[in-house]
C-alpha cells in the first residue's frame, strides 16, 4: 500500500493544490470571494478523492461547456477503492483459487454493468419505455464501483494468462480489431472491456514500440494534468484557433507539464527500489 501511496498521492496533491491556487486569475470573482468557502471546500473534497462534492472552483471555467477543474480525477477514488479491496480479494484467492475468484468478480461486474445498462435503455426515469437513459437511476447505477471491477479483474486475468496469450499475439490483434468493429457498429459499447483489454495487451507486449521508460513514466502525470490544461486553453480562447494548431499546442503543454511533474515530484517520492525508477536507471546506465 505504501508503494501505491508514494506513486499516486504526491502528484495528485500537487496538481490539486496548484490548480486551486494558480487558477484564481481566471475566476470571475474578486480575490476575496475566490479564496472563500468554495475554495476550501474544493481543496478539502479533492484532496481526499471526493471530487464529486466540489468539482469546480468559484467563478472558474464558468463559460466552458464543463466547468469542472479536473474531471479526470473521478477515477482515482475508484482506484483507491480497488487497493483497499485487495487484502480481501487476496484472502479469498488463497482460499478458493485466484482464477476462480477473479472469474467470479469479472462475471459479477459484467452482470451489474450490462444489467443496469439494459434497464436504463428500457425504462425512463418516470417508468415510460424509452431509449434515452439520461438521468435514469439505472444509468447512474451502471457506472458505479461494482461495474468498474470488470476492468480490474480483466487486468489480473490478463496477467494470469500472460504466458499463454503471448503465444497467440497475432490472433489477439485480429480478435481485438473484430471486437472493436462489432462493438462500434452493433453493440454500442457493451463489449468495450474486451477490446480495451486486447489493446492493453497488444501495446504492453509489442516490441516495436520502443522503451520509453528510459525517459521516465509520464503516463500518470499526463492523465492528471491534461484536463486542467485543456480547460485553461479553452477559457483563454485557444479553442478558436485552427484545430491542428490547438492540438499541437495542447499536446506540447500537456507533455511539458507531465515531464516536469515526473522529475520534480513523482520520481522524488518513489523509493530507489521502485521499478519505475529502476527502468529509467537501467536504460541510462
Regions found by a protein language model. Name each.
Residues 65-78, 114-151, 162-167, 180-200, ...:
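Interfacial loop-to-helix transition and helix-capping segments at the boundaries
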Residues 21-26, 88-97, 156-165, 181-186, ...:
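Structural signal for the C-terminal ends of transmembrane alpha-helices
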Residues 177-267:
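Alpha-helical transmembrane segments of multi-pass integral membrane proteins
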Residues 13, 17-21, 25, 84, ...:
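Generic alpha-helical transmembrane segments of integral inner-membrane proteins
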Residues 8-78, 194-199, 203:
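Membrane-interface helix-loop-helix regions
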Residues 100-110, 170-180, 219-222, 250:
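Central hydrophobic cores of alpha-helical transmembrane segments
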Residues 269-285:
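Membrane-proximal cytoplasmic C-terminal regulatory module of class A 7TM GPCRs
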Residues 80-111, 159-171, 239-243:
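Solvent-exposed interhelical
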